[in-house]
């Protein structure tokens, strides 16, 4: 397995459970990938953008959990915009029956091989 990579996870708060599933996959001993979640858990405030940008800069890449909720999540939109300026971004669809597209984000089906390929490319 490649060295452990630091990954920032951008997600709409409504998709927090999916973020938890992604983190759980990384802890699975049979998982072909592992990462450190750098997402900002604090509530949105005046220094939030500064903290997000700092964490994205310290990350090797960004995974965006894409769903219909992404379209109305101002926080996730800003995280993705910042990430596109700073790092490599991979979108993964958060749900099997939701194929929302975000402009400028390469989004793929949530599979271990797809995530492993992205992480190994960092």
Segments predicted by a language model, with ranges:
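Conserved TIR/SEFIR loop-to-helix hotspot centered on a Trp-containing motif
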Residues: 68-86
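Short beta-alpha junction loops
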Residues: 69, 92-100
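C-terminal helix of von Willebrand factor
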Residues: 110-122
């Amino acid at each position: 397995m490649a060295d452990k990579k630091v990954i920032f996870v951008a997600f709409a708060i409504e998709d927090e459970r999916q973020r938890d599933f992604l983190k759980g996959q990384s802890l699975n001993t049979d998982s072909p990938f592992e990462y450190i979640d750098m997402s900002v858990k604090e509530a949105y405030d005046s220094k939030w953008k500064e903290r997000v940008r700092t964490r994205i800069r310290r990350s090797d890449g960004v995974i965006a959990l894409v769903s219909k909720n992404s379209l109305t999540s101002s926080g996730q939109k800003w995280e993705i915009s910042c990430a596109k300026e700073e790092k490599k971004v991979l979108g993964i669809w958060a749900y099997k029956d939701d194929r929302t597209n975000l402009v400028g984000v390469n989004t793929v089906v949530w599979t271990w091989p797809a995530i492993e390929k992205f992480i190994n490319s960092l």
